[in-house]
């Protein structure tokens, strides 16, 4: 009986030890490019809720589009002894050194939505960003199969912006070569800011004497700025224009006819998946990958989700059905 009692005591102690070790809060640092953009506010809320529901603590900081601020914030997170670092980079070219610091401390690193180049990443989660660009260009070509096109790229330091452009040109290059489409301007928008897109579009309209038939804009913020310039010249609704992110303002513009389409990236799926992967990384669990991308240093295992083109015809079946926006907020 004594032996049995001792064994039971030992098992009980081990169970308590195991349980307390398992319940130790996993600490995740979430470094966000710029919370001034509606898009990232949604990602933050969904990610934090999911990670916390899985027993993790999440520390969030926004760099407001500033490289040095993001590096400093990541260093601060490293000093807080986080287990996993999740980064939405402002500039995917400047974080390799600070990521090396994190790795030396045994911290796992997950790139969220945007790939970070030449860095020792553990995993990458995003959408198929070349497909985003293809959807944008295909939608605009369907409305304006010929004419003068203006290409409005995103931030020149955002790797995704380059992938969007790559996808766009897969569709546009044959039409440019055949002469059906003429590119009358091509500019990138620093930090994806609407006010910069407004200035770029104003200058483009002046340079082309308002003779622009379509704008391939890479996201909704830049589309919004461009549409302001088009409206001032009485061209709103006459010039086809793409977007991305399914921002509420953009969906409203699609309803009123000033924006042609947006690309909806089901952010709930992305943020939930990223939170799951972050927790799995922290627990050293095996992670399911469905792709691999080379970032210049290594082949990074990745999980890529499918984006969806949204126009007037399928708003109900996409953003409303998913609860991304309510019918009331869109139509009232």
From Swiss-Prot:
It is found in: Periplasm. NCBIfam families: PRK10355.1 (NF007680), xylF (TIGR02634). The gene is xylF. Involved in the high-affinity D-xylose membrane transport system. Binds with high affinity to xylose. Belongs to the bacterial solute-binding protein 2 family. GO terms for biological process: D-xylose transmembrane transport. It comes from the Bacteria. The lineage of its organism: Bacteria, Pseudomonadati, Pseudomonadota, Gammaproteobacteria, Pasteurellales. This is D-xylose-binding periplasmic protein. It comes from Haemophilus influenzae (strain ATCC 51907 / DSM 11121 / KW20 / Rd). Gene3D superfamilies: 3.40.50.2300. InterPro entries: Bact_Solute-Bind_Prot2, Peripla_BP_I, SBP_2_dom, XylF. GO terms for cellular component: outer membrane-bounded periplasmic space. Keywords: Periplasm, Signal, Sugar transport, Transport. One of its GO terms (molecular function) is monosaccharide binding. Residues 1-23 form the signal peptide.
